[in-house]
Every structure is written in structure tokens, then in C-alpha cells.
Amino acid sequence: MVGLSRLADGGLLLVLALLPLALDGKPAPLEKAPMAPARIIPYLRPVGKESRAALDRMVPPEDGDSRRLEGLAKEALGEGCFGNRIDRIGDVSGMGCNRRTPAPKAPLRILPYLRPIRKE
């Protein structure tokens, strides 16, 4: 009987490597993965005119003419940074992306605090 110390020296790797071999020296047959023809069939259908036009809009042009994609890119861009609306930063402080009106200059923001308080 082989001791565990011998198997730990590298014999274990040899046993694990030879494990899939059958007694006659041929590799054990591997199980085949089941095919799912229902998922493959829709992709084999011919492309119609409407779907071909949709695919043409999604695929970038090969000749370098990107004017067709400019309209789609502008539509996808939202009111905030990277298409996401930013309420606190963009609206309140004016520090967000895609601002429509520039932020007021610093002196205009400070003036209301510099006015003397009237006591009546």
C-alpha cells in the first residue's frame, strides 16, 4: 500500500492525471452539452428591411462618415453629466456638465451677504 507521504511528493498528480483513462488505455468519453436549437433558430432567420435599417443605425460606418451617428449621440445625451441628470451640482451651484446658463460670477453671489441689515 502506498503511503500518503509518497502521494504528496507528486504521485498524487500522476494519479489525478491518469484518472480519466479507462482500463483499456483509452480516455473516458466526455459528456456532450445539450444543444438548445430553440435559441439558435431566431438568429438564422433572414433579416427584414426594418431590422436591417435598425442594424445599419447601430453599426458605425466603415468609411469614416459619422454624420449619421451624430444625431443619435445628441439624442442620447441627457441634461446632466454623461446623460444623467445631476440635481445638486448642476442646478444649485452651476458646476455640473451641460449647463444651459453659465454660473453667476463670484461677486454677484456674495453681494446679498454684504448689504447692511436694516433695523426698522
UniProtKB/Swiss-Prot annotation:
Signal peptide stretch: 1-25
PROSITE patterns (UniProt xref): NATRIURETIC_PEPTIDE (PS00263)
Q: Which GO terms describe its molecular function?
A: hormone activity; toxin activity
Record flagged with keyword Signal: yes
* Location (main, coarse): secreted
Q: Tell me one Pfam family matched here.
A: ANP
**What's a GO biological-process term for it?**
regulation of blood pressure
Q: Could you confirm whether the keyword Disulfide bond appears in this record?
A: yes
List, alphabetically, the InterPro entries matched.
Answer: C_natriurtcpep (IPR002406), Natr_peptide (IPR000663), Natr_peptide_CS (IPR030480)
UniProt KW keywords: Disulfide bond, Hypotensive agent, Secreted, Signal, Toxin, Vasoactive, Vasodilator
Query: Hey, what tissues is this thing expressed in?
Result: Expressed by the venom gland.
The similarity comment for this entry is: Belongs to the natriuretic peptide family.
What's the protein here called?
A: Natriuretic peptide
